[in-house]
Each structure stands twice: as C-alpha cells, then as structure tokens.
C-alpha cells in the first residue's frame, strides 16, 4: 500500500470519528439519553432546591454561620407591596392563587419552568480560563437571575410555591392511609385527596429567604350521584379538586400575610 492511499484512509477515519471516538457503549448511552430527553419533554420541569437556594443546601456550614443567620434582621413584606409570584412547573400560577394574592399584594407573575443550560460540546475554547467558567457556573442559579429581574422591576419580594396533589387510600394492614401522587386516576369514595404546598419567600434586596409548608387539608372523595354519566362524574371530581385548592390557597395566603406583613 503506497503512502497516498494510507494518508487518505487516515483522513477518512478521522472524519468519521468526529471530535471524539465512541464505542458501542457510548452509542447505547446516547440512545438512552435521547429516550430520557423525550420523556422529560412531556413532563413539565419543576424547580429544584438548587434553583431556589443555589449551593446553600450543600455548603459546609459552621456554627458561626448559623449564629450569624439567627442575628440577621427579619424581613417584612408590607401589604400592597409589589411581588413576583411563581408556581413551580407552570408558565404562570393558577388563576385562583393569583386572585387570592392580589387581595393583599401587587402581583406580577413569572414562569416556574427553569431554562436548563445546554450540555458542553467538544468545540471548546481553549483560550478561555476554565477556572472562571467553573466559578461562574457555581455562582449562577435561577433565583439569582430572578432577583435581578425583580430588582429591575422594583419588586419587594419573590414568592415561589411548589405544589403536589395526592390521593390516599386506607391500608388495613398498615392501619394508616398510604399516599401517592395524583395522575388523573379514576377516583372512588374510598379515596382521599390532599394538596401539599411549600412556600419560599425571598427578599429581593438582600437575598434572605424563608421557606415553610402550611398545614394541609384532606378531603374524602364524594361518591358519584346515581344515574350520572361518566362526564358528570369527571366534572364532580374536578370541582372537588378545585375546592380543595381554593381552600388551601386561601389559608396559605392568610398565613403568609400574618407572618410577614
């Protein structure tokens, strides 16, 4: 084989290989990632603790840090203050929640679906300082960006709530109710409903935050009325869920106002 043919073969292999050579295992991983990505696209992304609190939940905390946090001033959100309201996993908070909040505050809304960063590619800028890139990635988080948006709009606070509707069924063996996430399942009168919510309140100026979960309500699903078709039964279920949410939102907002006005 002469040198020209050998050179052509080498060039061909390098083009096929791209920026990195991949084994059959790499191909399987890629396919799995694509499959997982397609699944995730169908499920709204929820805000995580890292989105809300940055790296605070994973940092090494000293006793001095705790005492300094205790000595910090408590922040307040006076009535009629301009605030940003966010519901995790939704483009906008539910209308009934917005209406309840507007009784006490001037409300603007923001999307609760985080924009995830694109994965790194092999086309890397070698001239860039890698340490600076790592530091920037560690310091940037969703809440920090939203605080900047709120500051530009002269908002006083950011209120984020994460919610979860669950169904429960009594287990005679365990002698307790077993709860699981509601997935549009058909409900019977043996099922209970509960609506779990966690609030995170962030002061725009200081970044100080507080988080808590109000006491939740539990509803027993009402049995369908006799001689009612499936559509009527579905409407009745939706009404019960809406009533549960409305009652929960009303109590939650009242609790928020009492704590921070």
UniProtKB/Swiss-Prot annotation:
Q: Which positions anchor the lipid (S-diacylglycerol cysteine)?
A: 19
- The lipid of kind N-palmitoyl cysteine is covalently joined to 19
Location in the cell reads:
Cell membrane
Classification from the root reads: Bacteria, Pseudomonadati, Pseudomonadota, Gammaproteobacteria, Enterobacterales
- Keywords, ordered alphabetically: Cell membrane, Lipoprotein, Membrane, Palmitate, Signal
Q: Which organism is it from?
A: Escherichia coli (strain K12)
Q: What is its main location?
A: membrane
Q: Where is the signal peptide?
A: 1-18
Q: How does it sit in the membrane?
A: Lipid-anchor
By what name is this protein known?
Uncharacterized lipoprotein YafT
Stretches that traverse the bilayer: none
Q: Which gene encodes it?
A: yafT
Q: Which GO terms describe its cellular component?
A: plasma membrane
């Amino acid at each position: 084989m002469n040198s020209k043919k050998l050179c052509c073969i080498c060039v061909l292999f390098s083009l096929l290989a791209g920026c990195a050579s991949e084994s059959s295992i790499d191909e399987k991983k890629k396919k799995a990632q694509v499959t997982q990505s397609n699944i995730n696209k169908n499920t709204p992304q929820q805000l995580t603790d890292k989105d809300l609190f940055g790296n605070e939940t994973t940092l090494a905390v000293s006793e001095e840090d705790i005492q300094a946090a205790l000595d910090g001033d408590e922040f307040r959100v006076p009535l009629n203050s301009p605030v940003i309201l966010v519901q995790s996993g939704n483009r906008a908070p539910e209308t009934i929640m917005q209406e309840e909040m507007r009784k006490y505050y001037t409300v603007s809304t923001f999307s609760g679906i985080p924009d995830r960063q694109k994965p790194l590619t092999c086309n890397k800028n070698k001239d860039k300082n890698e340490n600076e890139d790592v530091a920037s990635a560690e310091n940037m988080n969703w809440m920090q960006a939203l605080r900047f948006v709120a500051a530009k709009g002269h908002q006083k606070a950011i209120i984020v709530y994460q919610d979860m509707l669950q169904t429960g069924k009594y287990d005679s063996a365990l002698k307790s109710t077993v709860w699981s996430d509601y997935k549009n399942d058909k409900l019977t009168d043996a099922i209970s409903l509960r609506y779990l919510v966690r609030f995170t309140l962030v002061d725009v100026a200081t970044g100080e935050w507080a988080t808590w979960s109000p006491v939740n309500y539990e509803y027993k699903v009402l049995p369908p009325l006799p001689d009612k078709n499936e559509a009527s039964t579905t409407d009745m279920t939706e009404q019960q869920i809406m009533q549960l949410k409305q009652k929960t939102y009303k109590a939650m907002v009242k609790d928020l106002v009492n704590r921070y006005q």
